[in-house]
Amino acid sequence: MTLKINLQKSVAEMLVLSILNNGTMYGYQLIQELEAQSKGLFSIKEGTLYPMLYRLIDNNMVSFEKKLVGKRRTRVYYNITEDGKEYLQQILKSYQDMVQGVANVLVKNGQSIHIVTE
C-alpha cells in the first residue's frame, strides 16, 4: 500500500510539474489540463492538488502569485521554479528507469505492455 501511495504521489507531482513547465496556471486550470492531456486517465481532486502545491512551494519547486480577477476575486497562479525544473528532470529519469525495469521483467517472463502515445 505504501509503495502505491508513494508512486501515485510521485507521478502526480511529475505530471503537475510537467504541465507547469509549459506555463503558469491556477489550481482548477491544472486539474482540467491534467485530465484533458491524459484523456481522462488521470484526475486529481482539489483536496489532493492543493496540499501537493503547498508542499512544492515549501520545497521551492513552485512559486505563486495572487492576481485580482474581476473587481473582488483573487486567483492564485502557480509557476515552476528553476529548482522545480531540476526536480522534474530527476523525477522523469527515475520514472523512465522504473518503466524500463518493469518492461524488462515483463518481457523476460513472456508478458508485454503496449503503450500508445500521440
Model regions and ranges:
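Intrinsically disordered, low-complexity serine/threonine- and proline-rich regulatory segments
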Residues: 1-10, 91
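Short, solvent-exposed loop/turn elements at beta->coil junctions and helix N-caps
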Residues: 4, 67-69
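N-terminal helix-turn-helix DNA-binding core of bacterial DNA-binding proteins
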Residues: 6-48
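Basic amphipathic alpha-helical segments that dock to polyanions
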Residues: 49-56
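Glycine-centered, phosphate/nucleic-acid-interacting loop/turn motifs that mediate DNA/RNA or nucleotide
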Residues: 60
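Short beta-strand "wing" residues that participate in macromolecule-binding interfaces
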Residues: 64
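Basic, amphipathic "hinge/linker" alpha-helix immediately C-terminal to the N-terminal HTH DNA-binding motif
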Residues: 70-92
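Amphipathic alpha-helical dimerization/coiled-coil segments
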Residues: 86-118
